C-alpha cells in the first residue's frame, strides 16, 4: 500500500523512494493486529508498530488513529472485488505522509493498484512513469505506472506493476467509479487480471492522523 514501499489494504507507494510509506505489499508479511467482518464487507488492518488503534463495525464503517512510528494501513471493501461504484464518506486527517485510496490487487497479471483520493505531504507519483489521465467523478486523475522488483505480494515474493490514478482535486467522500479507471488503464497498455480484494484504505508512514470512514 504505501511504501518504502504499505499493506494488505490499502492506501501505498513506491518502494524505490525511501521517504515513501511502505508498500502495502510489504506490510502483508506482518501479523494483522486485528481484522473483522461486518456489514457484508471485507476488513483488514495491519501495522508494524504499536501506536495505532483500529475498530470496525456494521455498515462498512471503520475508525483508525495512529501516531508517529512505522507503517499502518486499514480499510473496508470487497473480496473478491469487481468493477463497481465505490461510495465512501466520513473524516480523514493526516499529518505527514498518508494516503486515502481505493486499493486492490489482481492476479494474472499480478497488479497492485491505487485510486488515490487524498494524500498528505508525499505525492505517490514521485518516481513513477506518467501514462496519461482520465476524467471521472468530478476531477482529472493522473495515471502512473511503477514496478516493484522481488517484493512481497499476495502471491509471495514477486515482481509486479503498480498502477496509480491520482486525483487532482483532493477530497474525502464521494463515489469512485472504479470501472472508469480500470478501462482507462487498459486503454493505456496497463492490463488487469482476475480481481482479488479491493478496499477503501487509509495508510500512514511515519506520520500521525485519524480516519472515520464508511464504505458502501
UniProtKB/Swiss-Prot annotation:
Induction comment from the UniProt entry of this chain: Expressed throughout the entire infection process during in infection of rye tissue.
Subcellular location: Secreted
PROSITE patterns: GH11_1, GH11_3
Catalytic residues as annotated in Swiss-Prot or TrEMBL: 112 (nucleophile), 203 (proton donor)
An example molecular function term from Gene Ontology annotations: endo-1,4-beta-xylanase activity
An example Gene Ontology biological process: xylan catabolic process
Pfam families assigned: Glyco_hydro_11
Family to which this protein belongs: Belongs to the glycosyl hydrolase 11 (cellulase G) family.
Signal sequence coordinates: 1-19
GO cellular component terms listed in the entry, alphabetical order: extracellular region
Catalytic activity: Endohydrolysis of (1->4)-beta-D-xylosidic linkages in xylans
Organism, scientific name: Claviceps purpurea
Catalytic activity, EC: 3.2.1.8
Phenotype of gene-disrupted mutants: Leads to significant reduced xylanase activity.
Name the UniProt record assigns to this protein: Endo-1,4-beta-xylanase 1
Gene3D superfamilies noted in UniProt: 2.60.120.180
Domain named GH11: residues: 29-216
Cross-referenced InterPro entries: ConA-like_dom_sf, GH11/12, GH11_AS_1, GH11_dom, Glyco_hydro_11
Function: Endo-1,4-beta-xylanase involved in the hydrolysis of xylan, a major structural heterogeneous polysaccharide found in plant biomass representing the second most abundant polysaccharide in the biosphere, after cellulose.
Pathway annotation from the record: Glycan degradation; xylan degradation
